A protein has these predicted regions:
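Cytochrome P450
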Residues: 1-132
Length: 132
């Protein structure tokens, strides 16, 4: 699924803060109840233990519905369904009207401005050809 894989690999939410509700242990580190934790969505969505070859873009990926680009459970973004629908429409229209998409800069030149909550490119310089 193109939309879900784009969301997984380019998670729009940088992180969220949560409070541990009980004493826990994660990777050998004790986490007492009441500890404030920062959940890095992009790390979770690229975790090789959760997604085979988590750094790779693969629209045929299994278990894609387990990605957490918009959070999870009661904390899930209320606009997630709308955002997904907007992406579906945008990709469909772009593919219907244009061809030969190309990134106009080296990927290393793409810049994500610092933001505590959200993650998005400052610019996406691309070129394409209109369909006739």
């Amino acid at each position: 699924d193109l939309v879900e894989e784009v969301l997984r690999l380019s998670t729009p939410t940088a992180n969220m803060w949560r409070v541990a509700t009980r004493d826990s242990k994660l990777s050998g580190v004790e986490i007492p109840a009441g500890t404030m934790l920062q959940v890095r969505y992009s790390s979770a969505n690229r975790d090789d233990a959760q997604f085979d070859n988590g750094q790779a873009f693969d629209v045929t990926r299994d278990k894609i519905n387990t990605q957490i680009a918009f959070g999870y459970g009661v904390h899930m973004c209320i606009g997630a369904s709308l955002a997904r629908k907007e992406m579906q429409v945008a990709f469909r229209v772009l593919l219907e009207r244009f061809t030969d998409f190309a990134l106009d800069v080296d990927p290393s030149e793409l810049h994500y401005p610092p933001n505590v909550l959200l993650r998005g490119l400052a610019a996406l310089p691309i070129s394409f050809i209109g369909r006739t």
